Amino acid sequence: MSRLAVVFGGSRGIGRAASKLLAQRGHRIVLLSRNKEAAQSTAQSLPGENHLGLSCDVSKEEEVQKAFETINKTCGTVGFLVNAAGINRDALLLRSKSEDMLSVLHTNLLGSMLTCKAAVRNMLSHGGAIVNIGSVVGVKGNAGQCVYSASKAGLEGFTRSLAKEVASRNIRVNLVAPGLIHTDMTAGLAEEAAVRTIPLGRFGEPAEVAQAMLFLLESPYITGQILLVDGGLQLLM
């Protein structure tokens, strides 16, 4: 059955791969990005029809509210929500600027809280499924990523708690925690050295994370779970 899937951070990386896979499955996509042109261009490139690209900065509540007002008026009921918008500002804690800390927390944690709040209101009458994007760093921690790790660890606790709150309304909430994936965030890493820490011996691809997300979105008896998609990286951290 075709459903309306709302994908934040859908114009690149994991979010783009998720949008493409969901469209291939026959779902209608509302794709959101801070860059309106990128959102619209990506939406137009997806298989199928009637996809929509909108601009939204998830760290700003008024923009999230405006986006969902548009979705509610023009698209109807939301079946799936994917929270793939995220940033990092990696640095040792003593070298981290407070404005960077706030930017990471507001985008990675508060942003997903705001989008979930708006989506749940839409889903209350008919149910739905939400997948948040965390990180293996949120599970295990990593030197030089204290703030990013905190934002993703907080998202895990939020995901489990929200799953408990809305299960009675047939709304499922899960989280995918990727490891090292070929995206803009990992473009500057020394890949040859990094893969030595991964049991499967390679970086993952956005499409592989998208497959895990699709599994959670379409699995009717799974909620409150954290699914690591990391090639076994957590085994050696």
Swiss-Prot record:
Q: What is its EC number?
A: 1.-.-.-, 1.1.1.-
**Predominant place of localization:** mitochondrion
Q: Which InterPro entries match?
A: NAD(P)-bd_dom_sf (IPR036291), Sc_DH/Rdtase_CS (IPR020904), SDR_fam (IPR002347)
Compartment(s) of residence: Mitochondrion matrix
Q: Which residues form the active site?
A: Y148
Residues that hold substrate according to the record: S135
One term under GO cellular component: oxidoreductase complex
Q: Which residues bind NADP(+)?
A: 11-14, 34-35, 57, 84-86, 148, 152, 181-183
Q: In which pathway does it act?
A: Lipid metabolism; fatty acid biosynthesis
GO-annotated molecular function: 3-oxoacyl-[acyl-carrier-protein] reductase (NADPH) activity; oxidoreductase activity, acting on the CH-OH group of donors, NAD or NADP as acceptor; quinone binding
What SUPFAM superfamilies does the annotation carry? Answer: NAD(P)-binding Rossmann-fold domains (SSF51735)
Alphabetical keyword list: Fatty acid biosynthesis, Fatty acid metabolism, Lipid biosynthesis, Lipid metabolism, Mitochondrion, NAD, NADP, Oxidoreductase
Q: Which GO terms describe its biological process?
A: fatty acid biosynthetic process; protein heterotetramerization
Q: How does it assemble?
A: Homotetramer (in vitro). Heterotetramer with HSD17B8; contains two molecules each of HSD17B8 and CBR4.
Per its database record, what is this protein's job? The heterotetramer with HSD17B8 has NADH-dependent 3-ketoacyl-acyl carrier protein reductase activity, and thereby plays a role in mitochondrial fatty acid biosynthesis. Within the heterotetramer, HSD17B8 binds NADH; CBR4 binds NADPD. The homotetramer has NADPH-dependent quinone reductase activity. Both homotetramer and the heterotetramer have broad in vitro substrate specificity and can reduce 9,10-phenanthrenequinone, 1,4-benzoquinone and various other o-quinones and p-quinones.
What family does this chain come from, according to its entry? Belongs to the short-chain dehydrogenases/reductases (SDR) family.
Q: What is this protein called?
A: Carbonyl reductase family member 4
To which species is this protein native?
A: Danio rerio
Traced from the root, the source organism's taxonomic lineage reads:
Eukaryota, Metazoa, Chordata, Craniata, Vertebrata
Gene behind the chain = cbr4
